[in-house]
Amino acid sequence: KKQVVLTVERDGTTADITVSLEKVEVTVVKSRMLDDSLGYIQITEFTDGTSEQFKKAYSELNEQGMKGLLVDLRENPGGLLTAVCDTLEQILPKGMIVYTEDKSGHRTEHTCKGKTPIDIPLVVLVNENSASAAEIFSGAVKDHGVGTLVGTTTFGKGIVQQTFSLGDGSAVKLTTSRYYTPNGVNIQGTGITPDVESDWPENAEEFTNPNQ
């Protein structure tokens, strides 16, 4: 393990403290069973650890007899494109997840192998602060028809931005491309309209009822 030495000054004296550096993984996925058959997974952000955390939560809920799943993306600001694609790989059928296109028309596709498509009712909760990667997740679920979106229209961030370092130590962030849902929809400035609009979707459980 790498170590750093911190020098601390207190009451006119100094002391060196050796600290070991470790990777800290923030919990961005929380899950629980809402009742005997309905599972709930909240994703707060799409980071390097999201896919594995989702996989673990999804597996544990299945072991507990889950027959319907509620994925909560409300207040999720987005995150890494790779993270949302790896997460969707676990539930989508074979096909497009999302594609990006730059100003020259160069297109980059991100697809799903479809080895483990979800086979239970799925509801995705969204609101006006669900953005970027959260909208990629929502758009893919909606376009593939594997789940129902419930909530309010999402933020509407359908662009890809990159940060470029400058010689003086500063940096500039530029829009380099736009992303599109599997059906070719760019949601920049418009967002994704849910299938069921509700400010506080307290009744979302009914949309995952396997008996309906």
Go through the PLM ranges and name each one:
Residues I41, V172-L174, I187:
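Short hydrophobic-aromatic micro-motifs
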Residues K1-K157, Q161-F164:
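Cleft-lining beta-strand/loop regions that shape enzyme active-site pockets
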Residues A15, I187-Q188:
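Generic structural signal for well-ordered beta-strand positions
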